[in-house]
């Protein structure tokens, strides 16, 4: 097969259609003789047909399927680079003839594009490739099996050609133009030339070597007429075009017989090696490139198909749904006529039509029957299933948010790829695209605009409603019907009493129309003077003050003899103005001189008590705006409700809460970007108030009424209440219990109370904190005898001091100045306000409010039980001692040592059954039952009795009581900070007796401090033995397990203690003033078992009943 010229990337299509002119053996080849040679050229096309061309007539003429006249002048420098030096340049418009020798080394080294000749497929060729051979060349090619004949010299190289043809290695091939047999660059690269869209020729050979037979299968060239054949068929590379279908038939003008020409030969080992070295890499690269192109094209087609499919599915579903709605809602009226009207009317009409269509039961196709029916038609179910499947398939195939993003809606692509310019944007999720943001912003604007339009239309409706109401009120108002002008004779009578009522307004110098014009005709000088002054202003309008014409002014100075300077100045002023007096026809008459015929009583409308006109539930605004001039609004009814303290609703939306803090932020129309940054900073700065639990605020350690410097008492009552609220917030851990407990306030309301304190009180807050933590009190001799109290008892004393001990007798008994700030503050919260100084005088109503609020705020605390004075005024409250029982702690015990002890086998096992515990508690239960039965059998006494006081269930007369009106306990000495809960409070008859009362003999001794008998005489059932106090020792430590049972030690003392208890009750009962009312005997008091291991004397604990 003849080799072709190398492929040129910048050449036209003619560069691949090269004519090879072979000279006869007997002539010497030169450029001139080659041109004038009259031998015909044979054109062999790819389809194997033989054509005849006359080169002498038209060198550029060739008979192809699409013969065209082409200009080859531009190919001279490109082709000349591959020719030898003895070849002249090719003239224009002539067929290219191979006139030199191409060496494979020069071609391969000088042109690196030979391996890329596959790229020039359809771009360079528009028709099938054509090879030209001379008849002499074909004749020599036919002698393949014979020995090489001596060839004619071609370009003076016949000797070299003869030598090369005599070699045994080259017997099967014929060398032309004296050159070595070159190798083909890429012989169509594995058969891909025939499969390209344009059927171009992909490669050429660098020398004029024609093998008689095809080479190796993978190194031969395939010519195929079918342009759409298989592109990678490597097994069909054996030259079917030149062996079978490309056989040359006898020419019409040829003298030699070319029929049955077959290109046969043997394989060349050298060409196989060279083919395999260059062709393998280029073929693989071309295949990969071709595959990538096909894949990209298929991807684009698939995307277009998905878009078309999604649009078709959408159009189909919209069409089906539209038909379904048209069929279902066919009974709806036409609303097009209502569109020019207001939107409100259109909405109402549409809603009414929908309700009517939904309630229709006449037709089976109505919406109500469709919605109420349990079954759906088969066709509708089928459409629903298919529509859902199609939509889901389209979404999964087309939506990038489903295919390319993770489950959280975020893409897994790195940030560098996200910022890369990609017009397709397959990796960017929908929420990150600008279209999504634009749609979200547009939806926000549309929603706010719709809300604004709805509210504007609602306001217009309200304005029309208010206008109608105003017109109705004016229509129903009615006019005042006056009588006719009275005759002049009646005017004279009327003037005399009216003359003294003529008054003026000093501020405006205007007179009131009270005298008619006919008065000027009378002859009295003073009357004429008055009428003259009145006629000048008879028809003038009076200036209203606050909407009311003021008629109650001082008497006119003109009536007084001896005119003042104001009256003279007023008279001269009127004369200068030359005011025209009213006409004397009597038409302009004062209204007060005419009789009233009819006057309809008008309704008085008060805006404060008007019912809201709107039917909507009004939500009170907690923040009063700065533009609120009128405190009462007739529309919303928010008159005096806004004066309440602001309470932020934390469950409300964010914009609504921000609108309460800043009036520039609208709760609906404002965008998130409109919120000032300062509001966000405030929420960050004040976050500790929301995050810090209120219970973590440490209570004050100690509170004593120590004398401090007096504070100015000029603060108002509200400031005192706020200060009291501030102090009570520090005492939140001290709790109060009331017989009518109310719900506790939340932590947020406590914060609001603290935040409601004015700035003056916030400045004084550190002072109050120093007041709550005072220095130790001055040493008192009685203070050393007191038992140490814990902090909870001190707080209970202070709180009870707040509520119950702030009366005048209590304040008089204290050793502190009455103008102490805390005492003055506590005195305002008393139920019986007795002021200690002029600065602490408040009313009873204002003093009771903080007490009620404080009782509502506190909750019941089981660790700090305080009984108010209103509940137990005549009893003594004693702190329970079982709180301070020392319990043993856990310790590690070696089990091996316990197992080895011999006493463990003889140790008695404790009985823990229910029967054993019931037997142990039987005595205590009987005693408790007897005590409660005795309490219910006591005869009832009047609670507010003046001559009797109930201390332990019995009545004792007050003989020398200093304050017999109210049963008050003794006023204690509060100079030292000991517990107020143990001063002089007896136990309530209804309250259960503490276990400690039965664990000791009833020795009547005083507990804490001396009674102030001078201030108040308290007669108790137990006498006071002395001023010294018996110290109370705690329980002694015990070692467990106990060596002896304490039951045997206490059985001996049981009878003696019962007898002592009976004697004590008889003695106390004999002190009553009434002999007829014999008090019932008390049940026997059985003490509990002693828990001490030491003598019984140390276990005796004195106590009061």
From Swiss-Prot:
**What biological process terms from GO does the record include?**
chromatin organization; positive regulation of DNA-templated transcription; regulation of mitochondrial transcription
Which PROSITE patterns does the UniProt record give?
Answer: PEHE (PS52052)
| Compositional bias annotation for Basic and acidic residues | 741-753, 780-804, 1008-1019
What keywords is this UniProt entry annotated with? Acetylation, Centromere, Chromatin regulator, Chromosome, Coiled coil, Cytoplasm, Cytoskeleton, Disease variant, Intellectual disability, Isopeptide bond, Kinetochore, Microtubule, Mitochondrion, Nucleus, Phosphoprotein, Ubl conjugation
Instruction: Give the region (Interaction with KAT8 HAT domain) as residue ranges.
Output: 910-928
Q: In which tissues is it expressed?
A: Expressed in the brain.
Coiled coil start-end = 283-314
GO MF term set: histone acetyltransferase binding
Is-annotated flag, keyword Hydrolase? no
- Domain PEHE, by residue range, is 884-1035
Q: What residues bear N6-acetyllysine in this entry?
A: 104
Q: Which InterPro entries match?
A: NSL1, PEHE_dom
Location of cross-link Glycyl lysine isopeptide (Lys-Gly) (interchain with G-Cter in SUMO2): 262, 331
In this UniProt entry, the residues modified to Phosphoserine are: 249, 268, 991, 994, 1045
SMART domains (alphabetical): PEHE (SM01300)
Identify the Pfam families for this entry. Answer: PEHE
Region named Disordered: 145-211, 225-263, 399-426, 733-857, 938-1034, 1058-1105
Location of the protein in the cell: Nucleus; Chromosome, Centromere, Kinetochore; Mitochondrion; Cytoplasm, Cytoskeleton, Spindle pole
Q: How does it assemble?
A: Component of the NSL complex at least composed of MOF/KAT8, KANSL1, KANSL2, KANSL3, MCRS1, PHF20, OGT1/OGT, WDR5 and HCFC1. Interacts (via PEHE domain) with KAT8 (via HAT domain); the interaction is direct. Component of some MLL1/MLL complex, at least composed of the core components KMT2A/MLL1, ASH2L, HCFC1, WDR5 and RBBP5, as well as the facultative components BACC1, CHD8, E2F6, HSP70, INO80C, KANSL1, LAS1L, MAX, MCRS1, MGA, KAT8/MOF, PELP1, PHF20, PRP31, RING2, RUVB1/TIP49A, RUVB2/TIP49B, SENP3, TAF1, TAF4, TAF6, TAF7, TAF9 and TEX10.
Q: Related disease?
A: Koolen-De Vries syndrome: An autosomal dominant, multisystem disorder characterized by hypotonia, developmental delay, moderate to severe intellectual disability, and distinctive dysmorphic features including tall, broad forehead, long face, upslanting palpebral fissures, epicanthal folds, tubular nose with bulbous nasal tip, and large ears. Expressive language development is particularly impaired compared with receptive language or motor skills.
- What is the name attached to this protein's record? KAT8 regulatory NSL complex subunit 1
Could you tell me which species this protein originates from?
Homo sapiens (Human)
